[in-house]
Amino acid sequence: MHLQWNIWTIRKEGEIMGDAIISVEELSKSFGQHEVLRKIDFNVEPGEIICIVGSSGSGKSTLLRCINKLETQTSGKIRYHGKEIGAVQKEINDYRSKVGMVFQSFNLFNNMTVLQNCMLCTRKVLHLSKEEAFDRAITHLKQVGMAPFINANPTQLSGGQKQRVAIAR
């Protein structure tokens, strides 16, 4: 595995770093006998942006899927504000409601509107009511400037607009 880490930090002038928001400790992931990640360690501090750069097949997406609990790591720990995120679905749902990731592929459903795409995950993953999912989707779409497009089909959007819908989701 040839995984290269580059970390850039963005902070307001005079901002002091605090405790890590996310801590990854000795995270390893194997698929059968194939070890994809081996004892990865890093923290995400308040105000930091982490950029992961590596060759194709080096484990970047697998790492992010483990951090977002879309994959279960073989060993190691993921902590959110010091609390380990285990395999209990409620803990995972609470964690996912606070931490999001946008992958290179937006994975928007073309047979659904922008609003329906945003509501789907909160309904299926976080088990929110239709009303709660609607309110949350509208709030997030407003935050990314996509509220005027709630009835649009993803095929009608530019790449940047699709990216913003994926962030809102």
Model-assigned labels for residue ranges:
Residues 1-28:
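ABC-family P-loop ATPase nucleotide-binding domain
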Residues 19-169:
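ABC family nucleotide-binding domain
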